[in-house]
């Protein structure tokens, strides 16, 4: 075997092993994977029935904050799971996102209402402040902070 061929046979596996360990030791950087804990922003919006105002000061303790809409097909798929969580004692706050109030109420009457409280965010301002990119999205909130 020629000298060059012997060197290549040695260099290629060593290089591949080195590359493997370099890639293994680097941090994976995926878009959206940089999660940060942040406080629920200040807001004052009406409930879905339009009878009361809800602010961030009304939301206490631990809960799931679920962004949903009646026009959202994926929300319909997720909805039975939320109902199971609610039936098992998990507190869920709904954030109705860019939705017509009457459509949202009809949707809940048809498919069940798993929410302890529903915020009507018709313009999407609170959702925007939370960094929502679409529905559904669900946040775990612990003492006023999204974790």
Residue ranges and their predicted role:
Residues 45-51, 122-124:
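Conserved SAM/SAH-binding loop
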Residues 1-44:
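N-terminal targeting signals for export/organelle localization
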Residues 6, 110-114, 121-147:
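Thiol/disulfide oxidoreductase modules built on the thioredoxin-like
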Residues 64-65, 92, 138:
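Hydrophobic beta-strand anchors of alpha/beta hydrolase catalytic cores
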Residues 53-76:
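Short active-site neighborhood of thiol/selenol oxidoreductases, capturing the structured segment around
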Residues 76-112, 122-128:
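Structural microenvironment flanking redox-active thiols in thiol-disulfide oxidoreductases
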């Amino acid at each position: 075997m020629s000298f060059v061929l012997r060197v290549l046979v040695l260099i290629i596996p060593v290089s591949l092993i080195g590359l493997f360990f370099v890639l293994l030791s680097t941090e994976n950087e995926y878009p959206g994977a940089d999660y940060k804990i942040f406080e629920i922003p200040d807001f004052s919006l009406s409930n879905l029935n339009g009878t009361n105002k809800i602010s961030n000061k009304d939301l206490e303790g631990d809960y799931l904050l679920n962004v949903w809409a009646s026009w959202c097909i994926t929300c319909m798929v997720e909805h039975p799971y939320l109902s199971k969580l609610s039936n098992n004692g998990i507190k869920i706050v709904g954030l109705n996102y860019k939705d017509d109030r009457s459509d949202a109420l009809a949707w809940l009457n048809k498919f069940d209402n798993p929410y302890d409280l529903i915020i009507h965010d018709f313009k999407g301002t609170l959702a925007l402040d939370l960094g929502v990119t679409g529905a559904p999205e669900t946040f775990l909130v612990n003492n006023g902070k999204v974790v």
